[in-house]
Amino acid sequence: MSSFESVVVIDGKGHLLGRLASIVAKQLLNGQKIVVVRCEALNISGEFFRAKLKYHSYLRKMTRYNPTRGGPFHFRAPSRIFYKAVRGMIPHKTARGAAALERLKVFEGVPPPYDKKKKMVVPQALRVLRLQPGRKFCTVGRLSSEVGWKYEDVVSRLEERRKAKGAAYYERKKVAARQLSEAKKSAKVNDKTAEALKEFGY
């Protein structure tokens, strides 16, 4: 992610939560606009039971006088958990940090128009490259559903629909490419057209 682009769309599946958050935070402060999709498929290192205990410990932290108003506010959705991880790595109470957070968008699943855009991965944050083989891990989506997130089945159903649509589009694209190559092979060019093409270097 060294080169600057207008908007970078990152597929969160298979990335470690903290490592991806640190890289995203740095790029946001540099002025890059970033969209992270499929936050429910982000990974957390360590076994699920340990992550759940840590989250329940976090849920017990509150203000004494008015928790509903004074916070801290405990986010359950995977996208908001990732957002809060990034926010903790940015000076969000300054103008520079607030402007950086404005450049971040996070989603569960892959909503339009990002389903038709090229998505990237961050090798420095991929679990298969950063964790040793055999190490335990869990997904943010499973943790969220255990602590109160209610939309895991909705997101999974929409994802299945999106994948089916994408597979059908790819099959149509393969058929069209095959027909085009066959048409190019069988196309006949008369002498006049061949001379005109030769004049332009074809």
From Swiss-Prot:
Q: Name one GO cellular component term.
A: cytosolic large ribosomal subunit
Can you name the source organism? Neurospora crassa (strain ATCC 24698 / 74-OR23-1A / CBS 708.71 / DSM 1257 / FGSC 987)
Function, as annotated, reads: Component of the ribosome, a large ribonucleoprotein complex responsible for the synthesis of proteins in the cell. The small ribosomal subunit (SSU) binds messenger RNAs (mRNAs) and translates the encoded message by selecting cognate aminoacyl-transfer RNA (tRNA) molecules. The large subunit (LSU) contains the ribosomal catalytic site termed the peptidyl transferase center (PTC), which catalyzes the formation of peptide bonds, thereby polymerizing the amino acids delivered by tRNAs into a polypeptide chain.
Q: Keywords for this entry?
A: Cytoplasm, Ribonucleoprotein, Ribosomal protein
* Record-level GO BP terms: negative regulation of translation; translation
* Subunit structure comment from the entry: Component of the large ribosomal subunit (LSU). Mature N.crassa ribosomes consist of a small (40S) and a large (60S) subunit. The 40S small subunit contains 1 molecule of ribosomal RNA (18S rRNA) and at least 32 different proteins. The large 60S subunit contains 3 rRNA molecules (26S, 5.8S and 5S rRNA) and at least 42 different proteins.
Location in or out of the cell: Cytoplasm
Domain of life of the source: Eukaryota
Q: What is its main location?
A: cytoplasm
What CDD domains does this protein map onto? Ribosomal_L13
According to UniProt, the name of this protein is Large ribosomal subunit protein uL13
InterPro entries in UniProt: Ribosomal_uL13 (IPR005822), Ribosomal_uL13_CS (IPR023563), Ribosomal_uL13_euk/arc (IPR005755), Ribosomal_uL13_sf (IPR036899)
Query: Which family is it part of?
Result: Belongs to the universal ribosomal protein uL13 family.
Q: Which Gene3D superfamilies match?
A: 6.10.250.3250, Ribosomal protein L13 (3.90.1180.10)
